[in-house]
Structures are given as structure tokens and as C-alpha cells.
Swiss-Prot record:
Species, as recorded: Daboia russelii
Higher taxonomy: Eukaryota, Metazoa, Chordata, Craniata, Vertebrata
Protein name, per record: Kunitz-type serine protease inhibitor DrKIn-I
Function: Serine protease inhibitor. Inhibits activated protein C (APC) with an IC(50) of 3.5 nM in the presence of heparin (to which it strongly binds) and an IC(50) of 88.9 nM in its absence. Other targets are also significantly inhibited in presence of heparin: trypsin (PRSS1) (45%), coagulation FXIa (F11) (40%), and plasmin (PLG) (70%). In vivo, synergizes with RVV-X in promoting coagulation in mice and by extension in Russell's viper bite patients.
Source taxon at top rank: Eukaryota
UniProt xrefs under InterPro entries: Kunitz_BPTI, Kunitz_BPTI_sf, Prtase_inh_Kunz-CS, TFPI/VKTCI-like
Domain BPTI/Kunitz inhibitor, chain residue ranges per copy: 31-81
PANTHER family, sorted: KUNITZ-TYPE PROTEASE INHIBITOR-RELATED
Amino acid sequence: MSSGGLLLLLGLLTLWAELTPISGQDRPKFCNLAPESGRCRGHLRRIYYNPDSNKCEVFFYGGCGGNDNNFETRKKCRQTCGAPRKGRPT
């Protein structure tokens, strides 16, 4: 296969992975954890997956501690926990 064909295949696989939803069974267990601000006193805007709404939502993180349901972007939250894309991405 030519290098152009390989690049096309890689692009299609990447697109497919972005569009394929993660089922609740495949979702990492930490996606079901409540957001934790942690023990420090920072005020960092972060994203967590909310299993009740099936959305990636904003919370404020203190900067240390907390749990793994803590993402810098909605895109990373969606990729990890499988929430559908809604509204403007971060």
C-alpha cells in the first residue's frame, strides 16, 4: 500500500474512533466518580464527566489531589468517557 493510502486509512480510523460512542460497559470506572476539587486552594477550570446527564461539565479544581474524572478539555473528556459532543468544544 502506498504512503498516501496509509495516511488515508489512518485518517479514516481516527475519524471512526472519534465518532464511535463508548458504551457504559466500556467506560472507565473513574468516569462515574463525582468531581473532586482536591485539597489545594487553586481555582482551575476543569471538565468532568457527569454520568447522570451523560455530558462533560465544568467544575473548579484546587490543583492537587482529586480523582481521575478531571480533564483539561471537553474533547479529552468525551474521548475518555464517551459523552456526545454538544455546544462549543473547549
